[in-house]
Amino acid sequence: MSKDPMSKPTPEPAAHSKAGPAVPTNFLRPIVQADLDSGKHSKIITRFPPEPNGYLHIGHAKSICVNFGLAKEFGGDTHLRFDDTNPAKEDQEYIDAIMNDVKWLGFEWAGEVRYASQYFDQLHDWAVELIKAGKAYVDDLTPEQAREYRGTLTEPGKNSPFRERSVEENIDLFARMKAGEFEDGARVLRAKIDMASPNMNLRDPILYRIRHAHHHQTGDKWCIYPIYDFTHGQSDAIEGITHSICTLEFESHRPLYDWFLDNLPVPCKPRQYEFSRLNLNYTITSKRKLKQLVDEKHVNGWDDPRMSTLSGFRRRGYTPKSIRNFCEMIGTNRSDGVVDFGMLEFSIRDDLDHSAPRAMCVLRPLKVVITNYPEGQVEKLELPRHPKEDLGMRELPFSREIYIDRDDYMEEPPKGYKRLEPNGEVRLRGSYVIRADEAIKDADGNIVELRCSYDPDTLGKNPEGRKVKGVVHWVPAAESVECEVRLYDRLFRSANPEKAEDGASFLDNINPDSLQVLTGCRAEPSLGHAQPEDRFQFEREGYFCADIKDSKPGQPVFNRTVTLRDSWT
């Protein structure tokens, strides 16, 4: 076998100019450390409480890494608890997908999966206690009336005419709500706090609403369901959560979180902490809008590689490590800001640069016949699977007929062109130097074949008396594997896709070139055995992953994970 000592890696991109802070910060670490040092807590328990009404997205990844990462760092536990209080929008499909995503990211929750619905009986009993204490009442206002009575940020609200119902009447009405006597929306149970509070969340918030809907966990047992604010703090208390960590939009909810804990006989009183959510440009993370993209078939499902969902990133070829590293890189703080998508791409490039085997795949094949190479002869070349890591060697047959990329030959090249041109020379990666002698064209003038000659003295060394600057990738014609390649790009053209012009929709920002499907591509023989989720660097093309759904050994389908360089800067 011939081994090419001059085979060199494709030049790698430099770190993205916005690669994040040199020292990532997490303001929660010293808080947790102080709580342990003071003896306030002997063990840290955090939780990740998604609502099962959609797939997890990249913003959830930050929350997962914060909660699971902190607990792991300090020897604690993290609970996975589904906030399943809105059965009309929830589905077992989402529950299964969320559990798979958490595991895929590399985290394990403590004990069994938990559900807020497990605590419905206790939450109901606590609601009755608030009624008995004169701190909750059944309200008959319509939603429109309730909005009017609530006031505004600059004007106080006013008390509902039903606010002073007797305890006995409220107990009776709440029991009848539970028994299913009333239609959806006819009545709600409210906490009696302060309609003049400057914090809108304390203006008699809803505790329970009527919803005749089948629940995926409790069936038809309930037709009244607690809202998130009444569920989340008490669930934390039941589970002994020490640090209830959420995003900054819940900061104004913390007084209500504490009010419930102060006014109910809960077993412990967790503390809520808030951090800034992940705002990633060129991305949408609204579950409602992500669902709209799926339902209206702008994308091919929740796991479409252009989606910001974790299952989408996984299918595109992102690794769990790259996403964890990205979340660590951007830090955890309380300052809202927008993170450049290039930082996420830098993270996956950095990971795959070290871990992805190299291979060659010709996306737009152009047949090359090497006229002076002996007919019937096949030479076995050896190329390294990786330029630095010890991943072994791969065998590549070389013979008279090969494919190169159509873009690597130009009859009238621009200045500085270093690929193949008439009477010009290039080196085939890991192989010989060839010269373009003749271009064969069809009746329409399209080039269908190149006739070239090779220099047999150039395997592993430069030719005598001349310098060859260009290097192109290639595959053998007979032994190469036909494959499909999907070139994915950012789904949105705008850095802020939700900011549409007047009368426009975020859908108007969809990038029409976000997916290009290439068929008839030719890959080196080793890629024919690729398993779903196998990742590679296609030399000179980018990083690719065998599709988790559609790729099969012998019939590979590859998704472009990321280009070799940031093409958006």
Swiss-Prot record:
Q: List the GO terms this entry assigns under cellular component, sorted alphabetically.
A: cytosol
What is the superkingdom listed in this entry's lineage? Bacteria
InterPro entries given in the database record: aa-tRNA-synth_I_CS, Gln-tRNA-synth, Gln/Glu-tRNA_Ligase, Gln_tRNA_ligase_bac, Glu/Gln-tRNA-synth, Glu/Gln-tRNA-synth_Ib_cat-dom, Glu/Gln-tRNA-synth_Ib_codon-bd, Glu_tRNA_lig_a-bdl
Record PROSITE patterns:
AA_TRNA_LIGASE_I (PS00178)
Positions bound to L-glutamine: 83, 228
Top-level class of the enzyme under EC nomenclature? ligase
Q: Which GO terms describe its biological process?
A: glutaminyl-tRNA aminoacylation; glutamyl-tRNA aminoacylation
Keywords for the protein's UniProt record, in alphabetical order: Aminoacyl-tRNA synthetase, ATP-binding, Cytoplasm, Ligase, Nucleotide-binding, Protein biosynthesis
Q: In which broad location class does this protein mainly occur, judging by the first location in its UniProt entry?
A: cytoplasm
- Which intervals of the chain are annotated as region Disordered? 1-23
Q: Motif 'HIGH' region: list the residue ranges.
A: 50-60
Q: Which GO terms describe its molecular function?
A: ATP binding; glutamine-tRNA ligase activity
Instruction: Name the Gene3D superfamilies for this protein.
Output: Glutamyl-trna Synthetase, Domain 2, Glutamyl-tRNA Synthetase, Domain 3, HUPs, Ribosomal Protein L25, Chain P
- Recorded catalytic activity of this chain's protein: tRNA(Gln) + L-glutamine + ATP = L-glutaminyl-tRNA(Gln) + AMP + diphosphate
Would I find Aminoacyl-tRNA synthetase among this entry's keywords?
yes
Q: Where in the cell is it found?
A: Cytoplasm
Motif 'KMSKS' region: where in chain: 284-288
EC number, as in UniProt? 6.1.1.18
Please name the Pfam families in this protein's record: tRNA-synt_1c (PF00749), tRNA-synt_1c_C (PF03950), tRNA-synt_1c_C2 (PF20974)
Q: Which residues bind ATP?
A: 51-53, 57-63, 247, 277-278
Could you confirm whether the keyword Nucleus appears in this record? no
Task: Describe its partners and assembly state.
Answer: Monomer.
Instruction: Report the sequence similarity comment from the record.
Output: Belongs to the class-I aminoacyl-tRNA synthetase family.
**UniProt xrefs under HAMAP family:** Gln_tRNA_synth
Task: Read off the NCBIfam families from this record.
Answer: glnS (TIGR00440), PRK14703.1 (NF011291)
Protein name, UniProt field? Glutamine--tRNA ligase
Native species: Pseudomonas syringae pv. tomato (strain ATCC BAA-871 / DC3000)
Q: Give the taxonomic lineage as stored in the record.
A: Bacteria, Pseudomonadati, Pseudomonadota, Gammaproteobacteria, Pseudomonadales
